[in-house]
């Protein structure tokens, strides 16, 4: 790591030379938040990654955005807490350990529950948590002393307290409902543990014979009603035929009965608005045990709900199922049933049909909707509390459009299945006696197991073997990590409720909404005031990354290729308004180039300040302290330094301009960060640093620095330090290194964020320096049009309202544009007009005018051709319909650019006659 007293930097920037040292320092000397401080809190809890996980681009994006906000708020004077931790990831972890046991020739059932759980904890100790080490490499400024795990003792107590309260409040209950069942892992699954995939399948149209054979069906056929289904193997569990009450085709059949094919069972024809009249043939078979919608229809109509598919995914050995199909695997049964339907004449049609199916994320086995007795939580009371909070503005979603999405889900909330048939997780604290009565610990003593309670000693209770859904613990994350249910703990009182949650929109329902409901339900408050949602990180073609597609990108490889700061730059630069993010290697290259630019600018400053720079100050170097005439011993805020710097009488126009622009950009970037528009903030700072500070100010300052102008030296150092502070939340490694190289013992992360001051805005200097920039741009453009290289010198003259400003600062224009500013020019000239400034260049003596005109006419013809080609694409409806939006925008830009060049050339040629 650079010694704070060094005066030089290596010629080349090498991220690998600085990143490991700073990362190690931030892990060993964490940014500990003080629960007793008088500062306003700013808390963000990490979306806890799975203990089984490795860092992927979603994690890298999440935590870069979080760390950017945390570092900004810490510098802005808040007591900032970035709370890290991991989720126990019930099914994922159990699958990993079971796979290891299988490789060793055993199983969890061979070991038994206690021994298996010991194996899981052993695995967690050795292999779990690798992702947190990878987050350290990302440079997150987390408070590692507060690291949490959802199976920690304190968090386990919170989970237990939650369930006990819900049960005794009548909100947690045991009942039969449709659940997502994984036949391979033998457990229910949450929606987030299911991958949705569209596969080629078949739609089967079946004939259900009507009880009154004289009646006509929907298509005028006599004695039958036609049903379309993608799952003919479930017909044996049918309990009704449903039609829409307003469907004229079927209204006359409501109340009659129809026979299930291949059976002698008759079911009623009912009317229900759940039926989509346009789907299939407009009539729906109702199988309450094997479809969520059918289950709800069955509830409304009091239908029975027998199941014909067992927990292994086979047809049951039940009298409802004809003997020849009993015990068949469900997909084999489908083929057998279709064949039998063909033979019986009840299969009227089968056609190709794209079917959306759910696959278990871990086992890749198709999920089976089945009825199962599970634990559920009534969610509507909690959803109503969140909706009221949204109405009051207690929770803000960024971007705002997600508020409606959030609200729609809450308004249509369903009860939550919280039990899982696993061993790894929080075992449900419920016990049963031999009659099946349920016993749950007393709310006054939730830690006391019922089988240890003296009141129940005579009952020989057995504990529920199931565990809670992983989300049942992670929904407590914003407050269980801060000590809840101990609401008097220092951390809970200081840091709860948290300020911001940063996460992807894809878990808005599974996690974010549930945290909102848990927060209101258990603490009486919203768990966070702002939810900042970002999009999914996609590959360069806009597709989701997955192992099966082979399109995944390892962020650790990106770190090695570009450097972590460059990657953080890219992640933030690409983040725009909650939109999905396409991987763009150019942004990572841009980040690497930007880091190099910053490194070289600091090297230049160190070399130019030279012997005038005196080491030793903790906040500002003694040199700058003297240069801006600050009294010894007084540490001033950034804006005070700039204000006193501005009052010096040896500042140049460029010095005054960059001070004003720095102040304006500080205000702009701060406002963008406060609005959680992190992408806009880094784009603002990038443009200012590269274009204005490095390319314009430093170039303009070179003559003054060479002549020893103390005002310019002070301006260069103070502005550079401000730039490093502004960029620090985004690119912490390089800014920390460079700030230390400028003579600071305290790391930049604990310095104050620059404060804008309206008095520092200098409209006069801005207008004047803009005139210089226009003069330079015009001179460069003229040299290019005349066929000169950037290094060739050219005599130019200036005219216009701001010509005197340009003449007074001739050294700047001449040095940057490599021209000689002369009072006037003889003969024919070529001019470039900008607001307030016209630059003229001589034609005679510079070019062969006739030859030059001929070249411009040829160029004009080329431009006409290019405009027609680009415009032709835009006029092609097929191209516009197929091409990505960015390609279309590029063609529009080409038309505009070529048009502007053409207009310029036509004007020049007309001027020459």
UniProtKB/Swiss-Prot annotation:
Top EC category: ligase
Motif 'KMSKS' region: positions: 544-548
Coiled coil: 851-912
GO cellular component, one term: cytosol
Binding positions for ATP per the UniProt entry: 547
Location of this chain's protein in the cell: Cytoplasm
Pfam families according to UniProt: Anticodon_1, tRNA-synt_1, Val_tRNA-synt_C
Example GO biological process: valyl-tRNA aminoacylation
A single GO molecular function term of this UniProt record: ATP binding
Keyword presence, Cytoplasm: yes
Keywords of the record: Aminoacyl-tRNA synthetase, ATP-binding, Coiled coil, Cytoplasm, Ligase, Nucleotide-binding, Protein biosynthesis
Reactions it catalyzes: tRNA(Val) + L-valine + ATP = L-valyl-tRNA(Val) + AMP + diphosphate
InterPro entries linked: aa-tRNA-synth_I_CS, aa-tRNA-synth_Ia, Anticodon_Ia_Val, M/V/L/I-tRNA-synth_anticd-bd, Rossmann-like_a/b/a_fold, tRNA-bd_arm, tRNAsynth_Ia_anticodon-bd, Val-tRNA_synth_C_sf
Tree of life domain: Bacteria
Family designation: Belongs to the class-I aminoacyl-tRNA synthetase family. ValS type 1 subfamily.
This protein's domain notes: ValRS has two distinct active sites: one for aminoacylation and one for editing. The misactivated threonine is translocated from the active site to the editing site.
Description of how the protein assembles with itself and partners: Monomer.
Function: Catalyzes the attachment of valine to tRNA(Val). As ValRS can inadvertently accommodate and process structurally similar amino acids such as threonine, to avoid such errors, it has a 'posttransfer' editing activity that hydrolyzes mischarged Thr-tRNA(Val) in a tRNA-dependent manner.
NCBIfam families in the record: PRK05729.1, valS
HAMAP family: Val_tRNA_synth_type1
Protein name (database record): Valine--tRNA ligase
Organism listed in the record: Deinococcus radiodurans (strain ATCC 13939 / DSM 20539 / JCM 16871 / CCUG 27074 / LMG 4051 / NBRC 15346 / NCIMB 9279 / VKM B-1422 / R1)
Gene that encodes the chain: valS
């Amino acid at each position: 790591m650079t010694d704070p007293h060094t005066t030089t930097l290596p010629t080349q920037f090498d991220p690998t030379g600085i990143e490991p040292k700073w990362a190690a320092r931030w892990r060993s000397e964490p940014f500990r938040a003080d629960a007793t401080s008088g500062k306003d809190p700013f808390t963000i809890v990490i979306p806890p990654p799975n203990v089984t996980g490795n860092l992927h681009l979603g994690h890298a994006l999440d935590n870069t955005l979080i760390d950017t906000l945390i570092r900004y708020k810490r510098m802005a004077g808040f007591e900032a807490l970035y709370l890290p931790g991991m989720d126990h990831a019930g099914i994922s972890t159990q699958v990993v350990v079971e796979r290891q046991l299988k490789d060793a020739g055993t199983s969890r059932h061979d070991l038994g529950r206690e021994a298996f759980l010991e194996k899981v904890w052993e695995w967690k100790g050795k292999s779990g948590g690798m992702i947190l080490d990878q987050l350290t490499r990302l440079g997150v400024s987390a408070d590692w002393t507060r690291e949490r795990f959802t199976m920690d003792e304190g968090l386990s107590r919170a989970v237990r307290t939650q369930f006990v309260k819900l049960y005794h409040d009548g909100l947690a209950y045991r009942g039969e409902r449709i659940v997502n069942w994984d036949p391979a892992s033998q457990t229910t699954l949450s929606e987030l543990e299911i991958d949705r995939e569209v596969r080629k399948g078949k739609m089967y149209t079946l004939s259900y014979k009507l009880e009154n054979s004289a009646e006509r069906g929907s298509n005028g056929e006599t004695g039958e009603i036609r049903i379309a289904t993608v799952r003919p193997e479930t017909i044996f569990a049918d309990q009704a035929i449903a039609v829409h009450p307003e469907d004229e085709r079927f209204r006359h059949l409501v109340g009659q009965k129809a026979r299930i094919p291949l059976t002698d069972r008759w079911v009623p024809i009912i009317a229900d608005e759940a039926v989509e009249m346009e789907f299939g043939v407009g009539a729906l078979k109702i199988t309450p045990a094997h479809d969520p919608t059918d289950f709800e229809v069955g509830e409304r109509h009091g239908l029975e709900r027998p199941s014909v598919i067992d927990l292994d995914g086979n047809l049951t050995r039940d009298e409802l199922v004809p003997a020849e199909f009993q015990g068949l695997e469900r997909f084999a049964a489908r083929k057998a049933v279709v064949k039998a339907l063909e033979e019986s004449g009840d299969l009227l049609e089968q056609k190709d049909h794209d079917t959306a199916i759910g696959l278990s994320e871990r086992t890749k086995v198709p999920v089976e909707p089945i009825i199962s007795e599970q634990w559920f939580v009534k969610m509507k009371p909690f959803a109503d509390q969140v909706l009221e909070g949204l109405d009051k503005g207690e929770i803000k979603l960024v971007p705002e459009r997600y508020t409606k999405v959030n609200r729609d889900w809450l308004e249509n909330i369903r009860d939550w299945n919280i039990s899982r048939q696993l061993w790894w997780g929080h075992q449900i604290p419920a016990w049963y006696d031999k009659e099946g009565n349920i016993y749950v610990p007393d709310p006054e003593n939730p830690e006391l197991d019922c089988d240890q309670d003296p009141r129940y000693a005579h009952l020989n209770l057995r504990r529920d073997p199931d565990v809670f859904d992983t989300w049942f613990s992670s929904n407590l994350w914003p407050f269980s990590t801060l000590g809840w249910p101990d609401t008097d703990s220092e951390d809970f009182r200081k840091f709860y409720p948290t300020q911001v949650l940063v996460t992807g929109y894809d878990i808005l329902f599974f996690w974010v909404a549930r945290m909102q409901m848990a927060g209101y339900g258990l603490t009486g408050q919203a768990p966070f005031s702002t939810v900042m949602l970002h999009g999914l990180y996609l590959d360069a073609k806009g597709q989701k990354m997955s192992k099966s597609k082979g399109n995944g990108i390892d962020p650790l490889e990106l770190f090695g290729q570009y450097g972590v700061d460059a990657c953080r730059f890219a992640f933030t630069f690409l983040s725009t308004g909650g939109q999905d993010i396409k991987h763009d290697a150019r942004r990572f290259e841009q980040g690497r180039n930007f880091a190099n630019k910053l490194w070289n600018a600091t090297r230049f400053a160190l070399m130019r300040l030279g012997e005038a720079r005196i080491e030793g100050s903790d906040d500002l170097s003694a040199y700058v302290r003297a240069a801006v005439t600050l009294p010894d011993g007084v540490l001033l805020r950034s804006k005070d330094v700039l204000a006193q710097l501005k009052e010096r009488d040896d500042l140049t126009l460029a010095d005054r301009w960059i001070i004003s622009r720095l102040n304006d950009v500080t205000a702009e970037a701060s406002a963008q960060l406060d609005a959680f528009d992190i992408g806009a903030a880094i784009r603002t700072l990038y443009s200012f640093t590269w274009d204005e500070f490095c390319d314009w100010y430093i170039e303009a300052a070179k003559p003054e620095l060479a002549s020893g102008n103390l005002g310019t030296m002070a301006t260069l150092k103070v502005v550079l330090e401000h730039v490093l502070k502004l960029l620090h939340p985004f690119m912490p490694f390089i800014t920390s290194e460079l700030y230390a190289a400028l003579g600071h013992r305290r790391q930049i992360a604990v310095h104050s964020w620059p404060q804008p001051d309206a008095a520092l805005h200098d409209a006069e200097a801005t207008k004047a320096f803009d005139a210089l920039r226009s003069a330079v741009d015009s001179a460069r453009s003229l040299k290019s049009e005349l066929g000169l290289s950037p290094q060739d010198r050219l005599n130019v003259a200036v005219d216009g309202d701001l010509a005197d400003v340009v003449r007074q600062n001739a050294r700047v224009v001449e040095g940057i544009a490599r021209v000689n500013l002369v009072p006037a020019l003889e003969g024919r000239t070529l001019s470039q007009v900008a607001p307030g400034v016209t630059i003229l260049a001589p034609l005679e003596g510079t070019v062969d005018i006739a030859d030059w005109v001929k070249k411009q006419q040829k160029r004009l013809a080329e431009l006409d051709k290019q405009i027609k080609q680009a415009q032709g694409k835009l006029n092609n409806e097929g191209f516009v319909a197929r091409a990505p939006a960015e390609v279309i925008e590029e063609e529009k830009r080409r038309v505009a650019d070529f048009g502007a060049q053409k207009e310029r050339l036509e004007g020049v040629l007309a001027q020459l006659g």
